[in-house]
């Protein structure tokens, strides 16, 4: 959420930032709404002050035995008391209206983010590794998995409907191995603290990270009003909500391997075959909580941590700097890691690493206090995939396919597979 004080002082900057995101200017309407809020609040405070003053004057009038003045003051106090509930309700209503309007405004992009309307304007930042050179025809992951008898989409559809997958045998073990490898890497070498967070969260948590109120259609809600998490970013980031942290102990770095649940409401007709776009999938998430001065450097560090997963798996990928029109709602800058999938003859996103500034912290009221500073500041938050297990599995299956249809297990995963080096069709 953006600060209304900043908007009042930087109206042109806000409208320019919104234009870069392809949105209409909003500063004038927001400032007008804020002026109404301030006027209503001032009127309410004036009424409260006059009620309090008149109440004191009644005592003075009674002491002077001026019953006429005392009666007038009593009538005035009674009128003010009767009028105050409506004034308080109007103040609450306009405060909520402004808060709702602010909650729907996307974050402002950093100055070095490329300007563009959609993914076609994203910029290749670097390319790592090389595409595999084969003699055999590349196959898509679902063709390989079904041929091995270890990937079942029809069975999943009978149980749960479309966009679900059943993994069996050594493919199920391979996905588990990927998750264990990623957690060991991030906790053992990258300094992240492993967390097992709730998978169900309240409205406030979704609001804090920016999924609500604007993106409820992308989420699954339970009958008791809780939400299934679309990413572990939600519970991990909300671990610091309503807290004042010790600035000397920042950054905090958290990681979690969780199922994620998404309705894919806007994805009709896209990636309908296979497990690229699922209602339920597993993902390792990275979250950092930093001070205001360190978040840009932390963004580069987090991206490097996610890249290390792909490097150790021996996968070819590229890093994209997303343009203003393709960035997420809460991001100030985002790097996407796109892994090469031979079966699709395309790069596909496998990780997205974003720096959010104090955008989420304002929604969560998460602050820190520096050692030499008076008062508090909002923390800065960052999040990234470290990485999505299903897409990592797809990349391994397609890139490590052998001529005979078997899959070579990447060296780094062999210890997690009990020494198994090749996945073959079961007899």
UniProtKB/Swiss-Prot annotation:
L-serine binds at residues 231-233, 285, 385. Its EC number is 6.1.1.11. InterPro entries: aa-tRNA-synt_IIb (IPR002314), aa-tRNA-synth_II (IPR006195), aa-tRNA-synth_II/BPL/LPL (IPR045864), Ser-tRNA-ligase_type_1 (IPR002317), Ser-tRNA-synth_1_N (IPR015866), SerRS_1_N_sf (IPR042103), SerRS_core (IPR033729), tRNA-bd_arm (IPR010978). Coiled coil: none annotated. It is an enzyme of class 6 (ligase). Its main location: cytoplasm. The keyword Kinase does not apply. GO terms for biological process: selenocysteine biosynthetic process; seryl-tRNA aminoacylation. This is Serine--tRNA ligase. CDD domains: SerRS_core (cd00770). Pathway: Aminoacyl-tRNA biosynthesis; selenocysteinyl-tRNA(Sec) biosynthesis; L-seryl-tRNA(Sec) from L-serine and tRNA(Sec): step 1/1. It is found in: Cytoplasm. It comes from Rhizobium meliloti (strain 1021) (Ensifer meliloti). Belongs to the class-II aminoacyl-tRNA synthetase family. Type-1 seryl-tRNA synthetase subfamily. One of its GO terms (molecular function) is serine-tRNA ligase activity. It catalyses: tRNA(Ser) + L-serine + ATP = L-seryl-tRNA(Ser) + AMP + diphosphate + H(+); tRNA(Sec) + L-serine + ATP = L-seryl-tRNA(Sec) + AMP + diphosphate + H(+).
């Amino acid at each position: 959420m953006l600060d209304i004080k900043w908007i009042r002082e930087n109206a042109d900057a806000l409208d320019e930032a919104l234009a870069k995101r392809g949105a209409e200017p909003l500063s004038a309407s927001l400032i007008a709404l804020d002026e109404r809020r301030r006027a209503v609040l001032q009127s309410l405070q004036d009424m409260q002050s006059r009620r309090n003053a008149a109440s004191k004057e009644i005592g003075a009038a009674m002491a002077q035995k001026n019953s006429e003045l005392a009666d007038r003051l009593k009538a005035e106090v009674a009128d003010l008391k009767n009028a105050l509930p409506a004034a308080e309700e109007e103040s609450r209503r306009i405060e909520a209206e402004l808060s709702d309007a602010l909650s729907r405004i996307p974050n402002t992009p950093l100055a070095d983010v490329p300007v563009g309307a959609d993914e076609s304007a994203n910029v290749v930042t670097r390319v790592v590794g090389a595409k595999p050179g084969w003699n055999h025809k590349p196959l898509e992951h679902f063709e390989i998995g079904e041929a091995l008898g270890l990937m079942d989409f029809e069975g999943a559809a009978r149980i749960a409907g479309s966009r679900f997958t059943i993994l069996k045998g050594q493919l199920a073990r391979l996905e588990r191995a990927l998750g264990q490898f990623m957690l060991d890497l991030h906790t053992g070498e990258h300094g992240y603290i492993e967390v097992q967070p709730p998978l169900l969260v309240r409205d406030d948590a979704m609001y804090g990270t920016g999924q609500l109120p604007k993106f409820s259609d992308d989420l699954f809600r339970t009958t008791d009003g809780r939400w299934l998490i679309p990413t572990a970013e939600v519970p991990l980031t909300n671990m610091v909500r309503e807290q004042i942290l010790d600035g000397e102990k920042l950054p905090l770095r958290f990681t979690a391997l969780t199922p994620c649940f998404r309705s894919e409401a806007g994805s009709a007709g896209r990636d309908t075959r296979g497990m690229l776009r699922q209602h339920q999938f597993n993902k390792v998430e990275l979250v950092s909580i930093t001070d205001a001065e360190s978040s840009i450097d932390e963004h580069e560090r987090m991206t490097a941590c996610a890249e290390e997963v792909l490097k150790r798996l021996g996968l070819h990928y590229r890093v994209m700097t997303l343009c203003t029109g393709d960035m997420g709602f809460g991001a100030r800058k985002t790097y996407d890691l796109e892994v090469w999938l031979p079966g699709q003859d395309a790069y596909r996103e496998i990780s997205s690493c974003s720096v959010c500034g104090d955008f989420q912290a304002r929604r969560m009221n998460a602050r820190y206090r520096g050692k030499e500073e008076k008062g508090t500041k909002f923390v800065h938050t960052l999040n990234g995939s470290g990485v999505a297990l299903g897409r990592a599995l797809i990349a391994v299956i397609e890139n490590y396919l052998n001529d005979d249809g078997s899959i070579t297990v990447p060296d780094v995963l062999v210890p997690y597979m009990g020494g198994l080096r090749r996945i073959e069709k079961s007899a």
